[in-house]
Amino acid sequence: MIEAKDVIKTFRGGALAHRRAVEAVRGVSLALEEGRTYALVGESGSGKTTLTHLLTGLLVPDSGSITLDGRAIAAYPARERFRAVQLVLQDGKSALDPRVNVGRSIAEPMINLGICAKKEAMRRAALLLRAVDMLEDAFHRKPAELSGGEQKRVCIARALSVQPRCIIFDETTAGLDVVRRRQALDLVRSLQRERRFAALFVTHDLAVARYMADTLWVMKDGAIVDTLERPFSSQSIHHPYTALLMSEDDLGVT
């Protein structure tokens, strides 16, 4: 479905000569297939966010390619990219319009993309709220009236509303306690198995990655330094950074 081949993305240093160019993504190759779950793990500044923006078509690589069904993803109209690949961000509150109630927030993508008329979109929004284990009264509430965990569930429901082929979860469980983190991850796992979208977790938290992923990529200094497949045996580790991550891992979600 989505494939990256030898992707490089460099950010120039700007007008001042002493500011060197930064190679944020260096020769990355990976593939995402529907029905599978992936994780991209790395510390802050490792290039995860840049790679995420490349995979969604928000950025264009300097060299290499990122394709959706064999066609450059950036060549698709924005509406088609938006429908195929959804991004669920870390901060649910800032991702939701504070002026709009929850039901409308979930329905709007369906209306704006012409998936269905307003009445049907609102009906589907109510069903999606149930799918993410939210009570019916949340439909008419504003984002500020919800907890952080509830806001993230609404964002997941909104992402599901356009029936995407891939959802990228960018630090989606950050800020949740252990119990709510486990609940959120189990919810996504259940939805992914039912709806068969590709799920990519972008995280600094190896515990989340190991709990969710079939395939785990470790990113450091803009490059994928290790690719691990479940059950993530230490014998498949090739890079010292991955070994360090594994040694420090506190699952917390088992």
Where do the model's predicted regions map?
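ABC ATPase NBD coupling module
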Residues: 16-19, 72-86, 100, 104, ...
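C-terminal boundary and immediately downstream tail of ABC-type ATPase nucleotide-binding domains
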Residues: 234-254
